[in-house]
């Protein structure tokens, strides 16, 4: 069949409007295994197909794109880079986005190949066209261009090609297209900056990082909201955090939060700014961040008390992130009654908010209450027990009630809360003394979907593997848990049937 494809390709090359042949070729190439096409790669004459893309015939273009998508998979990246450079270049300026997408997918293969990427780095015009693809209307085309340029920049030669040539001017020209395109270029710059301190140095020298930071701390609230997401991405790296601290950016963000009370439009950017500090606290030290920037935790508690679901959601997420580490738990515990009030609000929202916010509350509670076996000191166990009881008059029944609601996502999130505390003795005593709770855990008929069965199994596993459960639940219940565990999450109990003599 591969030979048939080669024959049809020759036929297509001879004709001016080979629609019938293209339809036949499309059927053949989809049917031929890729390894057979690779064996015939040297015989695949692809340039005529690229030429047919330029004839302004929609069906012909669609057929050629479909055929090329398949055939180019059989061609080595180095062959693409060396022998089809001009075709790739023309593909990037083609009016049809499907052709640009095809071309960029092949460039994506080339830049992943250490030998082939050199060919692209030596082709200034091709690089320029990739840069200009960032400015197009089609988002997937722009994203593919950003991805290729990010990959190119992983090497020293790539950094030099992008930042020490006319390409930097092209990048700055593309930014002038509109606000959306400018943010796409910032996205590229942050992607590159996040790789290493050397990459960040190239980006800062270009002036583009400084430009982004000026927009972040400028007066336009919508621009702030967009820029903080990118700056947060940079802060995920150690060298990025160091740079932001040295440049005074973290202090500036803190000051903007301080001034947010007098800004009627702060709702646009506050969630992003608070998330920034939440991520910072987790990646560095919750205690250091909260001590150095007290306004951060102050604002989180204030947002938890808000009537705005967006603000509440961010506060809940941030508390969950902070409380995922022992150090973060200690920081929250030190705030005393302030945090108890937050826990009451979380419990209230878990019961009364929208489904999406309920799930976020439950996820936060799971993070806050979880302790690994080595963390289960008397102090920490006393703390998680106190936190649990602060959420409601009867927190166990609160979460059990949520788990009984007919929404799998809520059911799983509530089971995760029980799993988080399942190996803590105080929680086991609560579960055992709560009427019907042990039966609820053992009852397989409650869960109907895979995710719920998996979540219940994780709860059973956490209980069964606990050192204290046999003593607290009793041996018979412990053996039932072990049996559930050995049967697996999807076990179905056989139903006994009685044969009746004479029945059909």
UniProtKB/Swiss-Prot annotation:
Sites of N-acetylalanine modification: 2
Q: Does the keyword Acetylation belong to this entry? A: yes
According to its UniProt entry, what is the function of this protein?
Acts as a chaperone during the assembly of the 26S proteasome, specifically of the base subcomplex of the PA700/19S regulatory complex (RC). In the initial step of the base subcomplex assembly is part of an intermediate PSMD5:PSMC2:PSMC1:PSMD2 module which probably assembles with a PSMD10:PSMC4:PSMC5:PAAF1 module followed by dissociation of PSMD5.
Q: Which PANTHER family match?
A: 26S PROTEASOME NON-ATPASE REGULATORY SUBUNIT 5, 26S PROTEASOME NON-ATPASE REGULATORY SUBUNIT 5-RELATED
Q: Which family does it belong to?
A: Belongs to the proteasome subunit S5B/HSM3 family.
Binding partners and assembly: Interacts with PSMC1, PSMC2, PSMD1 and PSMD6. Part of transient complex containing PSMD5, PSMC2, PSMC1 and PSMD2 formed during the assembly of the 26S proteasome.
Q: The organism's lineage? A: Eukaryota, Metazoa, Chordata, Craniata, Vertebrata
**Protein name, UniProt field:** 26S proteasome non-ATPase regulatory subunit 5
- Note what the entry says on domains: Rich in dileucine repeats, which have been implicated in trafficking of a variety of transmembrane proteins.
Q: Which domain of life is it from?
A: Eukaryota
Q: Does the keyword Chaperone apply?
A: yes
GO terms for biological process, alphabetical: proteasome regulatory particle assembly
Which Gene Ontology CC terms are recorded? proteasome accessory complex; proteasome regulatory particle, base subcomplex
InterPro entries attached here? ARM-like, ARM-type_fold, PSMD5
Assigned keywords, A-Z: Acetylation, Chaperone
């Amino acid at each position: 069949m591969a030979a048939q494809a080669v024959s049809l390709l020759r036929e297509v090359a001879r004709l001016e409007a080979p629609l019938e042949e293209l339809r036949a070729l499309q059927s053949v190439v989809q049917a031929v295994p890729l390894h057979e096409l690779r064996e015939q790669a040297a015989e695949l004459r692809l340039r005529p197909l690229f030429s047919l893309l330029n004839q302004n015939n929609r069906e012909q273009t669609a057929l050629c794109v479909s055929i090329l998508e398949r055939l180019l998979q059989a061609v080595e990246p180095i062959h693409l880079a060396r022998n089809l450079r001009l075709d790739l270049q023309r593909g990037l300026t083609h009016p049809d986005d499907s052709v640009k997408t095809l071309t960029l997918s092949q460039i994506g293969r080339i830049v992943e190949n250490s030998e082939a990427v050199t060919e692209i780095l030596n082709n200034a015009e091709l690089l320029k066209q990739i840069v200009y693809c960032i400015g197009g209307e089609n988002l997937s085309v722009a994203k593919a261009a950003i991805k290729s340029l990010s990959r190119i920049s992983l090497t020293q030669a790539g950094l030099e090609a992008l930042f020490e040539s006319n390409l930097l001017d092209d990048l700055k020209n593309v930014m002038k297209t509109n606000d959306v395109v400018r943010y796409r270029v910032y996205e590229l710059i942050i992607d590159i900056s996040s790789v290493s301190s050397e990459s960040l140095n190239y980006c800062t020298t270009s002036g583009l990082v400084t430009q982004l930071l000026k927009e972040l701390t400028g007066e336009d609230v919508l621009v702030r909201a967009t820029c903080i997401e990118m700056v947060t991405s940079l802060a995920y790296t150690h060298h990025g955090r160091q740079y932001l601290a040295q440049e005074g950016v973290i202090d500036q963000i803190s000051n903007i939060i301080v001034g947010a009370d007098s800004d009627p439009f702060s709702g646009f950017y506050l969630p992003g700014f608070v998330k920034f500090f939440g991520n910072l606290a987790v990646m560095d030290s919750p205690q250091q961040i909260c001590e150095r920037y007290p306004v951060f935790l102050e604002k989180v508690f204030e947002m938890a008390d808000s009537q705005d679901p967006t603000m509440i959601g961010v506060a809940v997420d941030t508390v969950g992130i902070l409380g995922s580490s022992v150090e973060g738990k200690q920081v929250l515990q030190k705030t005393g009654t302030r945090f108890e009030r937050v826990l009451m609000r979380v419990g209230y929202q878990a019961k009364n908010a929208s489904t999406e916010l309920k799930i976020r509350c439950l996820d936060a509670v799971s993070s806050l209450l979880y302790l690994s076996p080595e963390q289960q000191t008397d102090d920490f166990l006393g703390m998680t027990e106190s936190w649990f009881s602060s959420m409601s008059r009867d927190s166990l029944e609160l979460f059990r009630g949520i788990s009984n609601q007919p929404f799998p996502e809520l059911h799983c999130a509530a089971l995760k809360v029980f799993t988080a505390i399942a190996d803590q003795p105080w929680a086991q005593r609560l579960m055992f003394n709560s009427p019907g709770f042990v039966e609820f855990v053992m009852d397989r008929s409650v869960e109907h979907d895979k995710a719920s069965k998996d979540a219940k199994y994780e709860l059973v596993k956490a209980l069964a593997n606990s050192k204290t459960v046999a003593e607290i639940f009793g041996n018979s219940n412990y053996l039932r848990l072990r049996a559930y565990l050995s049967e697996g999450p999807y076990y179905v109990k056989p139903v006994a049937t009685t044969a009746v003599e004479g029945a059909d």
